[in-house]
A protein has these predicted regions:
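Short, charged phosphate-coordinating catalytic segments
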Residues: 1-14
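Short alpha-helical segment immediately N-terminal to, or the first helix within
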Residues: 5, 106-107, 120, 143
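Short, polar N-cap/turn motifs at the start of nucleic acid-interacting alpha helices
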Residues: 9-12, 73, 91-93, 112-133, ...
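Extended, non-catalytic subsegments within catalytic or DNA/protein-binding/adaptor domains
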Residues: 13, 22-25, 87
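DNA/chromatin major-groove-contacting recognition/catalytic segments
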Residues: 41, 135-153
Length: 153
């Protein structure tokens, strides 16, 4: 999804990104002010670097060995994410997919509704979203104690 983003899909004024998922299914994902600022900084630097090639409509670009700029491919993005996660994460696996799992779990742990998470991830079925959300045992215990009538007996 990320490598397919085009410049017109990223709207920092509205604080949203238009994402095209599987089977070209479109969804709108909100983004925060901090990310908007980083995107605007990226765009300024991208314009300076691309120069005459500024017409490239792809949001993410990379420089080829011959000096030309082109759309970033999935493998390059994977390598970048893996390297950066290795620098800052204690997780064993480092990939964009792990970031999706982490995002979904963090949203759930901070009170987001599972249906909202489903929409943000672009899942057609709730079952697919549930695979991405990892509740801790403590959270399950708290929910059980709060909601089940016989939990305190």
């Amino acid at each position: 999804e990320l490598v397919g983003l085009r410049e017109e899909d990223v709207d920092t004024r509205q604080k949203q990104i238009r994402v095209f998922g599987k089977r070209a299914k479109e969804r709108i994902v909100p983004i925060g002010e901090g990310l908007c600022e980083l995107i605007e900084e990226y765009r300024k630097n991208k314009c300076k670097l691309l120069g005459e090639q500024v017409g490239i409509g792809t949001f993410l670009v990379r420089k080829k060995k011959n000096g030309e700029w082109q759309a970033m491919d999935a493998q390059t993005l994977y390598n970048i994410v893996r390297a950066r996660m290795g620098e800052v994460s204690t997780l064993k696996k480092h990939s964009p997919h792990v970031l999706r799992h982490t995002f979904a779990t963090a949203m759930l742990n901070n009170g987001a509704d599972i249906r909202t998470i489903q929409s943000l991830l672009g899942h057609a079925s709730l079952a697919a979203t549930q695979v991405y959300t990892h509740a801790t045992f403590e959270q399950m215990k708290e929910a059980y104690e709060a909601a089940h009538p016989r939990s305190r007996k």
